[in-house]
Amino acid sequence: MENRNTFSWVKEQMTRSISVSIMIYVITQTSISNAYPIFAQQGYENPREATGRIVCANCHLASKPVDIEVPQAVLPDTVFEAVLRIPYDMQLKQVLANGKKGGLNVGAVLILPEGFELAPPDRISPELKEKIGNLSFQSYRPDKKNILVIGPVPGKKYSEIVFPILSPDPATKKDAYFLKYPIYVGGNRGRGQIYPDGSKSNNTVYNATSTGIVRKILRKEKGGYEISIVDASDGRQVIDTIPPGPELLVSEGESIKLDQPLTSNPNVGGFGQGDAEIVLQDPLRVQGLLFFFASVILAQVFLVLKKKQFEKVQLYEMNF
């Protein structure tokens, strides 16, 4: 009886341990796969440095273009679209974390003026919801609602990202004014080359850490290589580890120099940033402008009518 209870207890503990392990694995994998925007959020209080450089460029080293389109002017308390385009060749494949090839993902950060923020769901029209798709935006910080991040998301489906933005109303927000404001944006396609801790990803080129001769190249069981480099002058041996992904450019017996590329550069993506301007327009100014135009048109009409009346009087006097 005691042995049976002991067996049941051991079985219960094993089941519980396996369940916990599975949960930890799932949580860890989810965090890793969705961590790309989090890198900047965790490491930087503000994604835009004093120089104007967006911090995403610290990990995505290649430069690629992006395009941002916003209305020239908007009225207070109005929902409008900010459209970000991240162009790239859809046929390209990137190196994934496991060394295999796969489609490119994209991500973006949108830095709006103070007071502008993500539009609430009940203010977004059905047409705009259709343009947005299944994208889920989040604030860079709980207290920075004007800075939005998105990604990573599939590039083939979302190379054009539509942000639904709500403009502020100076009548209810004291820090909002009827002015021209700058908008900054950064967008990447593909994985980065550097992790926040400074280590390299497998989506970049690997260089030799020593001058010498390649004595041996060991192909690792899970992919990647270990390259033994021997210095001919003192016999010192250095081992460079290459993760799965980059293609090897050197062979055994080859003489190499310090910082010489050992692999190709597999990166096909890159990061770009841009800016635009938007005017928060005062409705009273718009009404005043419309009134002015109406007055000018009305004055022109009266002038034409007066001229025709004067011509008729002249013609009558000449006939008389």
Swiss-Prot record:
Plastid in keyword set: yes
A GO molecular function held by the record: iron ion binding
Superkingdom to which the source organism belongs: Eukaryota
Subcellular compartments: Plastid, Chloroplast thylakoid membrane
Gene Ontology CC terms: chloroplast thylakoid membrane
TM regions (residue ranges): 286-306
Leader sequence segment: 1-35
Similarity comment: Belongs to the cytochrome f family.
Protein name in UniProt: Cytochrome f
